[in-house]
Regions:
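Carbohydrate-active catalytic/glycan-binding domains of CAZyme proteins
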Residues: 1-212
């Protein structure tokens, strides 16, 4: 995320601790690790043991009302959030925002009216479905979900393995930037709608190249 002339980024850390590395840059080329957002994962009884490939999947960092937020999907436990006013300092303990199984690739979004949302994908290994995107409304402070989890796009016909939601709004349109097609043959999509729940039109904005 961008705050003034500073850029911040984080990444999946799965079960490794400290987790959620915080990277800072002023030019989007040179990056420095300035800290970590998570010292301990919950539930402790699960992560006190080796837990390969579990834990923090595909986090999203955002800045809202003077605070930095990171949300991530733990495919076995649900959606978690940590926040801070100083990204290089100490982050608050993780909050379980939404208890569930199979949710991954979460991204928060705050609208102009103060309402908050969390978009996400699904891990087929846990949820029993994938290739769809969904949206849940949150309380304005982003600490818990309210209402139902609604599928906003089904990619089975045109964009299988769609995942990795990143949410934005510009000129009255809600935008989702996300990958689809799987790792070996994947591509990047831009989707947009006048309604956060859709329907969404989409366009491939970056595709696989060829090496001769």
């Amino acid at each position: 995320c961008r705050v003034g002339n500073d850029y911040y980024m984080t990444a999946s850390s799965f079960g490794c601790l400290p987790g959620l590395p915080i990277l800072h840059s002023v030019d989007l080329v040179n990056w420095e690790i300035i800290g970590y957002a998570v010292e301990r994962l919950e539930p402790a009884e699960q992560f006190d043991l080796a837990s390969h490939g579990n834990g923090i999947w595909a986090p999203a960092i955002r800045y809202h009302n003077g605070e930095f937020y990171i949300y991530w999907g733990d495919p076995d436990n649900g959606i978690y959030m940590v926040k801070t006013k100083d990204p290089a300092g100490r982050w608050e303990k993780p909050i379980l925002v939404h208890k569930s199984k199979g949710i991954i690739d979460t991204c928060p979004f705050w609208d102009e009216d103060g309402r908050a949302w969390i978009g996400h994908g699904f891990a087929g290994s846990r949820a029993g479905l994938k290739s769809v995107l969904a949206m849940i409304e949150m309380t304005p402070d982003g600490t818990k979900t309210i209402g139902e989890d609604r599928i906003i796009y089904d990619g089975h016909e045109d964009n299988v393995t769609i995942e990795g939601v990143k949410l934005y709004k510009r000129d009255g349109y809600y935008y989702i930037l996300c990958p689809a097609g799987g790792v070996p043959t994947g591509y990047q999509l831009a989707m947009r709608s006048k309604d956060i729940y859709g329907p969404y039109e989409w366009k491939i904005v970056m595709a696989q190249g060829k090496t001769d």
